[in-house]
Amino acid sequence: MAPNHLSVREMREDEKPLVLEMLKAGVKDTENRVALHALTRPPALLLLAAASSGLRFILASFALALLLPVFLAVAAVKLGLRARWGSLPPPGGLGGPWVAVRGSGDVCGVLALAPGANVGDGARVTRLSVSRWHRRRGVGRRLLAFAEARARAWAGSMGEPRARLVVPVAVAAWGVAGLLEACGYQAEGGWGCMGYMLVREFSKDL
């Protein structure tokens, strides 16, 4: 097989540790930026200031009272992201997880899908990560095309009214957002905290 040949197949059992490390690395690449984005919004700054003021009456150290709320808030954001995207998903109705493999066996990306919560919601990407050594080489685009094909096939087999794919993206993951927009996806809301978006959702009718 050619060294640069890129294929997608189901993950093998012996590849779980490698895939898990890839997912964790993908979260680490964005978690600091997401935490910075979240904690520099005005409501978050106000809450941190209030918490620090309260702690000054309890703790003897001014520096500790100032830094402890920030540390706890950053830890909460990071733990939330790692729990959501930094672990292997359970088997879903769409099969998988799948891995992108370059050449004869170099695993360079991972993808997982799940059905939407309601009829007509289509399929959702629950995990999408590319090894940092293989980025900007078409792996993400190849996994996205595979996800679209799986979503279309699943919608047809389930009698869904439409084939649709939804991809959640952390607000700081500009490269992924750019790839999705270039492939015809549109941002349509998301979720966050205190009125500020932390994760945007991109969708496309297939």
UniProtKB/Swiss-Prot annotation:
Membrane topology designation: Single-pass membrane protein
InterPro entries referenced in this protein's UniProt entry, alphabetically:
Acyl_CoA_acyltransferase (IPR016181), GNAT_dom (IPR000182), NAT_camello-type (IPR050769)
Q: Where is the N-acetyltransferase domain?
A: 6-206
Instruction: Tell me the keywords, alphabetical order.
Output: Activator, Acyltransferase, DNA-binding, Membrane, Transcription, Transcription regulation, Transferase, Transmembrane, Transmembrane helix
Q: Where in the cell is it found?
A: Membrane
Query: Which EC number applies?
Result: 2.3.1.-
Please give the name of this protein: Probable N-acetyltransferase 14
Organism ancestry? Eukaryota, Metazoa, Chordata, Craniata, Vertebrata
Q: Tell me what gene encodes this.
A: Nat14
